[in-house]
């Protein structure tokens, strides 16, 4: 079952505005890349989330990291970069390749890699401008612990289809939040 059109359009609108206010020179295609990653994550759904209600889990999403008011641009970019890097790593595991359509997974890797490359170029521009640390150590740890909890959950659930569906939906929410941070 596909994502409802209204939800998909909301995700597209949110991600289209994501790179407009960053303090560096991201290519105009960056926001399209965000949209593409969200759409790919939506297309990757293989089973109904309703059949997996018993597997739901609170991964402790670090919302405070993604509240844009506390960050300057370099810290926000760094938080988004770390999040995308962790998503890339999560979907690069052995258990992931068995769970998803290989073609969609390859497209997701490509999209995430492109986002990482663009953000790294942006970070290198920002490092020369500011001397403040790129990302608060507590924020970095919060993001990494969040993804560790997700990885542990998958391991405990033996990488079941329902576990991956729960994680896919969580990653869509996480990616959308990190995208929103870019526009703050």
UniProtKB/Swiss-Prot annotation:
One of its GO terms (biological process) is B cell activation involved in immune response. Keywords: Antiviral defense, Cytokine, Disulfide bond, Secreted, Signal. SUPFAM superfamilies: 4-helical cytokines. It is found in: Secreted. InterPro entries: 4_helix_cytokine-like_core (IPR009079), Interferon_alpha/beta/delta (IPR000471). Disulfide bonds join 24-122, 52-162. PROSITE patterns: INTERFERON_A_B_D. Residues 1-23 form the signal peptide. One of its GO terms (cellular component) is extracellular space. Coiled coil: none annotated. Produced by macrophages, IFN-alpha have antiviral activities. PANTHER family: INTERFERON ALPHA-5 (PTHR11691:SF60), TYPE I INTERFERON (PTHR11691). Belongs to the alpha/beta interferon family. Interacts with IFNAR2. This is Interferon alpha-2. It comes from Equus caballus (Horse). The lineage of its organism: Eukaryota, Metazoa, Chordata, Craniata, Vertebrata.
């Amino acid at each position: 079952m596909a994502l409802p059109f209204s939800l998909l359009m909301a995700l597209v609108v949110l991600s289209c505005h994501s790179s407009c206010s960053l303090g560096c020179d991201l290519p105009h295609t960056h926001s399209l890349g965000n949209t593409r990653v969200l759409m790919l994550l939506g297309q990757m759904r293989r089973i109904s989330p309703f059949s997996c209600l018993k597997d739901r889990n609170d991964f402790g999403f670090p919302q405070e990291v993604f509240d844009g008011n506390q960050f300057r641009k370099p810290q926000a970019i760094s938080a988004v970069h770390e999040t995308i890097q962790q998503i890339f790593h999560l979907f690069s595991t052995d258990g992931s390749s068995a769970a998803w359509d290989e073609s969609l997974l390859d497209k997701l890797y490509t999209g995430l890699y492109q986002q990482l490359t663009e953000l790294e170029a942006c970070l290198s521009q920002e490092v020369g401008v500011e001397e403040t640390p790129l990302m608060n150590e507590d924020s970095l740890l919060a993001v990494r612990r969040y993804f560790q909890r997700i990885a542990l959950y998958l391991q405990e659930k033996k990488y079941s289809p329902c576990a991956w569906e729960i994680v896919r939906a969580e990653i869509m929410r996480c990616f959308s939040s990190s995208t929103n941070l870019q526009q703050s």
